[in-house]
A protein has these predicted regions:
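Amphipathic/hydrophobic helical signal segments and adjacent flexible N-terminal regions
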Residues: 1-70, 78-81, 183-213
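Charged, amphipathic alpha-helical segments
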Residues: 58, 90-92, 150-155
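N-terminal glycine/threonine-rich, aromatic-flanked beta-hairpin/loop signature
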Residues: 85-126
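Cytosol-/stroma-facing membrane-proximal "stalk/adaptor" domains immediately downstream
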Residues: 117-213
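Generic detector of short, locally flexible boundary/turn motifs and exposed helical patches
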Residues: 35-42, 62-63, 71-74, 86, ...
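Beta-strand secondary-structure signal
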Residues: 70-74, 95-97, 106-108, 132-134, ...
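Beta-strand elements of well-folded, non-transmembrane domains
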Residues: 77-81, 98-102, 111-113, 139-141, ...
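Tryptophan-anchored aromatic micro-motifs
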Residues: 65-89, 109, 168-174
Length: 213
């Protein structure tokens, strides 16, 4: 979105320059046009590079403060659901995968029984300076779990810790009137396609402060 706005700005400047030249009757020189074209191309390339990767650089994030969440997180879900025998469901091992650019973020949450994918997600900074990841999701139970759980929607939010080891913690709510707590304290830069492979992996580590890591 930012790169589009920048290209539009350059285009408007070119049009204004062209209109003024036509109104004053001045001859049009190709040199300024080449200059504006080169400037527009440069702005577009830099904006694209920032959107995809430059924003992740430590030095850049020290100025922007944007937390780096991109990667795979490992933790657990504590749900309000009660089993048929009346006992609460034990904590559920879970894996959170975050895809992040400078302006966009998407979230997928995997457990042994289901996969949740975000339909809308955003990274927000609160009045107290803390960052929060919020998203709306659709949960699709795996075939073996559909007798006890149906497809449903919900919302979730995770507050981002500020010191090593705090990780991500928050809660979720669903349209089935269930809710629960989410906690993720281990992180890996790799992308995993299932909960089982991520939970068995050995390359996860406790997280560090994100704006400075």
């Amino acid at each position: 979105m930012k790169d589009i706005r920048q290209q539009i700005t350059v285009g408007i400047v070119c049009l204004v320059w062209l209109a003024l030249a036509l109104l004053t009757g001045e001859a049009l020189s190709p040199a300024p046009l080449r200059l504006f074209s080169a400037a527009g191309t440069t702005v577009a390339i830099v904006a694209l590079a920032y959107e995809r990767s430059l924003w992740q650089w430590k030095l850049v994030r020290r100025f922007t403060g944007i937390p780096l969440l991109h990667g795979t997180w490992r933790g657990e879900v504590v749900t309000s659901v009660i089993r048929e025998d009346g006992d609460p469901v034990p904590p559920i091992p879970a894996v959170l995968h975050v895809v992040q650019s400078a302006s966009r973020v998407s979230v997928s949450l995997f457990t042994a029984d289901s996969v949740s994918t975000s339909t809308h997600a955003s990274l927000l900074r609160g009045d107290d300076g803390r960052w929060c990841l919020r998203w709306q999701f659709t949960n699709q139970p795996r075939p073996g779990a559909r007798q006890r759980s149906q497809r449903h929607r919900g919302v979730a939010e995770l507050w981002i810790g500020a010191v090593p080891g705090e990780g991500l913690s928050g809660e979720y709510f669903t349209d089935r009137r269930t809710y629960g707590e989410l906690t993720f304290v281990e992180w890996s830069p790799r992308r995993y396609g299932s909960a089982s492979t991520a939970l068995a992996a050995t390359d996860f580590a406790l997280v560090a402060p994100y704006a400075a890591s």
